[in-house]
A protein has these predicted regions:
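Typically the conserved alpha-helix immediately C-terminal to a functionally engaged Cys/Sec
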Residues: 94-111
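Short active-site neighborhood of thiol/selenol oxidoreductases, capturing the structured segment around
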Residues: 76-91, 116
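Bacterial N-terminal signal peptides that target proteins for export
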Residues: 2-13
């Protein structure tokens, strides 16, 4: 009887085989618009620290907090709109900026492909929602059902026919927690940018295929299951 995989990575690769993802991984690798599964992490990209105690990227959207205008600006620039909720003292928010977005290839990809509007979960700035309602940041978070931070909300790239609406109807995917690894974060943004959710709503299948790609690119001694 063959031995069972024991390490987490071997389990993941076994799942990829069991789910028939070898072909999917090859297809994704051959896709001309799919970016590399990883890239250079140096030079590191340190965040800014704002007066309200939040970490911030210098390229975050300079917004007047009218989300309709932010969407239009993102679309005109060929980007996707994402709204990021954070709060002061959030360790996962700090890690997002100091660990994940500090990696050069991740920072570059998100900056080049997304217009990110940062909001404070407890903030008092007035925000105009897509339906024209004007609410404080904290009231908007409550309206949208945002409880944890960091939470990112990705919007569809075309809101034709949805004018005057707000909420989940405008969102591209189900919300996922952002307290995860750099690779998962990167894969999620690629998955959304290229609208791969239109092929398969299951992000995990895409992510597992990308893990397999990364493993295949490692030198042989670094691959899981190698013994001396």
């Amino acid at each position: 009887m063959p031995s069972l995989p024991t390490s987490p990575m071997r389990v993941i690769l076994a799942l990829a085989v069991g789910l028939g993802l070898g072909g999917l991984s090859a297809a994704l690798a051959a896709d001309p618009v799919l970016p590399p599964p990883s890239g250079p992490v140096l030079p590191r990209m340190p965040p800014l620290r704002t007066d309200d105690g939040l970490y911030r990227q210098s390229w975050f959207q300079l917004s007047f907090l009218d989300l309709r205008d932010d969407f239009a600006d993102a679309k005109a620039g060929g980007k996707r709109l994402a709204v990021l909720f954070e709060q002061r003292g959030c360790v996962y928010c700090a890690s997002l900026h100091n660990d994940v977005l500090a990696a050069r290839y991740i920072n570059d990809y998100v900056r080049e492909n997304f217009a990110v509007v940062q909001l404070d979960l407890w903030g008092a700035r007035e925000v105009t929602d897509f339906d024209g309602s004007v609410l404080a940041e904290r009231a908007l978070a409550e309206r949208w059902g945002v409880i944890f931070t960091p939470t990112i909300v990705f919007f569809k790239d075309d809101l034709t026919g949805l004018e005057g609406k707000w909420g989940r109807e405008l969102e591209a995917i189900e919300r996922l927690p952002l307290s995860f690894s750099a690779d998962t974060f990167y894969d999620l943004f690629v998955w959304v940018r290229l609208k791969l959710y239109e092929r398969d709503r299951n992000f995990q299948r895409f992510h597992i295929a990308r893990i397999a790609e990364r493993e295949a690119l490692k030198p042989a001694p670094d691959r899981p299951g190698r013994t001396n």
